[in-house]
Amino acid sequence: MPAKSKDIFVVRCSILGDQNNLLGLAEALKNEFGGEIKVVDIRFRSRVLETLYLHLIQQKHESKIWDHVTSFFCVGDIPAKEEVDGAFVVSTLGAGELPAVYLSKLGAFSIHLGELKRIPYNLIDMTIAHPGHVTKVDEFKLPCAPSSIDEEKLLPKVKRNDLLVAFGGDTGSLTYSRNFYEKTLSLAAIAAERNRLTLKITTSHRTGLRNEEIIQEYIQDRSLKVDQLALYNQNDVPSMGFLLSNAAIALISAESVSMISEALAASAKTVAIYEHALPKEERISRFLEEQLCNNQIMLIDAISSDYIELASLQFPSVSWKTPFLSAVHRKLNKKNIRAAA
């Protein structure tokens, strides 16, 4: 087991939602094992060196020469071996796989979020499937995406008085219409008034400037009472943790697994709102159906609905931290037993 003072290295990811997921894992590890969270930007010098490195580390005969030559392969925030030995490294996406292996070879316990596409599973200590994916034999499944939101730091659920609308945006074959944004805002305004809640609205990097203009125009034309409008393209978006801190109810566009997971982590009553049909991407639709089956969310078609009946909607009870940390302890124990054998 890593010493209490060992750090958690987060391999930087350029996609905001995925980076937040990694920080959620890192926060959970920090609270359980201590240490500091360090975000590192590690890159291989070239594709050729990536291929060479992957080939070399799979050879059966290794020697201490690795301690002297591995730094040749990478550039960026390269920590010293003594910093990494016994620590954690968390990564995601294809770009994070080899940097995670690199730090793992220096002695870190490696955790990768998402399917491994470039390296064998035996090179990573623990692989976590993305929510909604069919879990493979070598992968661990969480009930929702990791989040850095700490529910204990939020207002008690019964004292919250916000209704938060969080828009994701177009993805893959999914393109939201103007009508979707306008109907969602209408439903949110009606729900906020009926439940005596304060209306707050936020967007994300996928919403797009044009759709943010649609949102602004609709609010102005209908004179909606909006307490806070946080637009991504105006660099005006606080963290989801902050926005959800007083949210009794969260209406979130259905394609955003990350934002839905954050609402669940914040114990907000969560409504996933879609246009005509659930997103076609199987991973997303499977995640939504799992949460619906477990009574964690409500699914609403914005186009065909005149209002949202929230009376039966319960506060979610899903937790990803407990099963995650239990799995980490099991994996650590197995690794330590193998190392001692």
Task: Give the residues covered by each predicted segment.
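Extreme N-terminal starter segment of soluble prokaryotic enzymes
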Residues: 3-9
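Active-site and donor-binding regions of nucleotide-sugar-utilizing enzymes
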Residues: 10-140
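Active-site donor-nucleotide binding/catalytic segment of nucleotide-sugar enzymes
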Residues: 11, 147-210, 232
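A donor-sugar binding/catalytic signature common to diverse glycosyltransferases
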Residues: 15-18, 240-282
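Short internal beta-strands
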Residues: 40-41, 127-129, 199-205, 274
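A nucleotide-sugar donor-handling region in carbohydrate enzymes
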Residues: 116, 121-180, 306-310
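Donor nucleotide-activated moiety binding/catalytic core segment of transferases
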Residues: 215-258
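Leloir-type glycosyltransferase catalytic cores
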Residues: 288-341
